[in-house]
Amino acid sequence: MRKIIFMAAAILFILTNTTFAARENVGVIIIGGAEFKTDDYYKIVKDELNPRSGAKILVGNDMQSRYQKYWLNRGYVGDQTPRRDDLISFTRMSGCGKVVCLVVNNSAVDSHNNAGRREKDRISVQIDAYICTPTAVADVFTASCDSNSKTSNLRARRGAFRKCLDTIAKSINRQI
C-alpha cells in the first residue's frame, strides 16, 4: 500500500512540475499604419518568427485588441506613441511572458513609369523590433529594406516587410 501511495505522489509531483515548465507565449504587436495590420502581415510574422525556445507566437487581431484595450484603460482612444514604460506595462498586462513590438515606420514609395511599359513601384520599409519582458525592454533590432513590384505597391510593401522581418528574425529568434 505504501508503494502505491508513494508512486501516486511521485507521479503527481512529476506532472505538476511539467505543467509549470510549459512553454511561454510570445505576443507580437504591430505598431504602425492600418495597412500593416492585416492577415497577410500576421501570416508573415508567424512564418518568420520561430523561437528556438519553442514558445508559441500570438499575433493577430486578438493581440492588437489587447493593445487597444491597454490604451483605452489609460484614457486614450486609438494608438499612441509608446514610451519604454508603456511597452513594459503592456507586456505585464498582455498575459504573455514576452512581447515583441514591431514599430513600422512610414514606408516610402518610389514609382517609375517608363514609356510604353508598366509602372514599377519601389517601397522602402523600416521596422524597429523591441523585445519586452514584464520588467524591461530587453533588446532592440532595426532593419530597413526595400522591394520592387511591377504589378502593385501592396505587393512591394509586403515584400519589403518580409525582408525586414527575415533580417530581424535571424537575431530575435534566439532571444524569444
Kindly give the residue locations of the regions a language model identified.
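Positively charged n-region of N-terminal signal peptides that target proteins for export
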Residues: M1-I4
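Bacterial N-terminal signal peptides
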Residues: M7-T16
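Single-residue recognition of alpha-helix boundary sites
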Residues: F13-I14, N114, V137
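C-terminal/domain-edge helix-coil "capping" segments
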Residues: A21-G27, F36, D40-Y41, M93-S94, ...
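N-terminal segment of the mature soluble domain
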Residues: E24, A34-C101, S171
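Short hydrophobic segments within beta-strands
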Residues: I29-I31
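Short, P/G- and charge-enriched loop/turn segments at secondary-structure junctions
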Residues: I88, N114-E119
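Charged, amphipathic alpha-helical segments
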Residues: C96-N114
